[in-house]
Amino acid sequence: ERVVRDNFWNSSSNITGIRQDSISRSYAEAYGSYEKGGFRDTWQAVKGWSAGAVTASIRHLEKISLKGSFAFDQTEGYGMCGSMFIDPGFYPVDILEFTPGRKTLQTYSFDGGISYDISEDWRIGASMDFESANMSKRKDLRHSNWKLDMTIAPGVMYHRGDLALGASYIFRKTAESIKAEQVGTAESSYYAFLDKGLMYGVYSVWSGSGLHLSEAGVNIFPVKDFSNGAALQMQYKGLFAEVEYLRTQGTVGEKEYIWFLFPGNEVNAIAGYKIRGKHHTHYARLGIGWESLMMDESILEKVTENGVTNVFNHGSNRILANESISVSPEYEAAGRILEIRAGAVLKWKESLSSQMYPYADYQSLMNWKAYA
């Protein structure tokens, strides 16, 4: 970890920067954990365990550098209900169910990257990060989830002396599908809640059309998000900076059944300064982020003629608007034996939800944490 953190380019989207360092390292780890307690979120397990393995490597050759890692994790949680998503809060919509049960989550991830010197002053490279996860709940209301998170980022760098300039393109796709089912023979159906923002939405029988968990033509709840953007990097001696912009376009539904659309914009900036002393190396880092996201609900009409059902889209209503700003300063001092790190994360978020005109609900949050 110290080798990775020593090179500021490793935290950027431009893989060509790994050649700004010449240290080759490999790493492997196996881990396990057990958790139990009542101080937890609504969707977290009453008790649970996880185990997994991680391996990573960076290799530098004469004109080429390679970077890669692989990880696997399995988590078992007991007494779980609430959000049906693998990563609650990642998307602006959520679905909640209320019967505690056991959940199993398996996560596979790998990343790879290559950087190549095409001339004395120019480098090119590309990287890919891939993560796949599946989760299942074994008690009604049962559900199975499949999640994908993939990022591809080609980059280029010009470097001469103490100066290095870089640029990279970023493409990211995330997707998750939820398939719900009721196997048991309960006297009544189970209920679920579709959260459309700030805990306003639809509460009904899980198979009702308002929840979209079980609809004619679509038997899953699919969410997709595509992001395209670019980043610029600069390094001069111990100073490093990067600015990144992403334009996102997300949908809930598939084919003609697009129930929600959530476009957004994201800007992130990071800066770092390194001073290498005789016995210690000092690092100062600063991250700043801004994100804006809107969500529109489609107005769909189903018309059946002669046994054929057609779906007509009559436009959409804006039902949610989110905007957030985050700041994260950090200081680190690393020596041969001792390492000290301290920092803070501050985040401001404003949300406006309006399910039905002219009624609206506004929320303003400020979160912070400090660590050492």
Predicted regions and their residues:
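Residues on the lipid-exposed face of transmembrane beta-strands in outer-membrane beta-barrel proteins
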Residues: T55-R59, F110-Y116, I152-Y158, A230-Y236, ...
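Outer-membrane beta-barrel domain signature
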Residues: R40-V46, E97-K103, K139-H143, G217-V223, ...
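N-terminal, post-signal peptide beta-strand-biased segments of exported outer-membrane/organellar beta-barrel
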Residues: E1-Y78, Y91
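Transmembrane beta-barrel strands of outer-membrane/channel proteins
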Residues: S26-Y34, G68-Q74, A126-S132, A167-K173, ...
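Outer-membrane beta-barrel channels and translocator barrels
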Residues: L61-I64, S119-D121, H159-G161, K237-L239, ...
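Short, flexible helix-coil linker/hinge segments at the edges of structured domains or between repeats
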Residues: C81-D94, R138, F171-K224, Q249-W259, ...
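Outer-membrane beta-barrel translocator domains and adjoining extracellular loop/strand segments
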Residues: G38-A45, G79-F85, M135-H143, I178-G184, ...
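Residues that define the transmembrane beta-barrel architecture of outer-membrane proteins
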Residues: K47-A53, T104-F110, S144-I152, K224-A230, ...
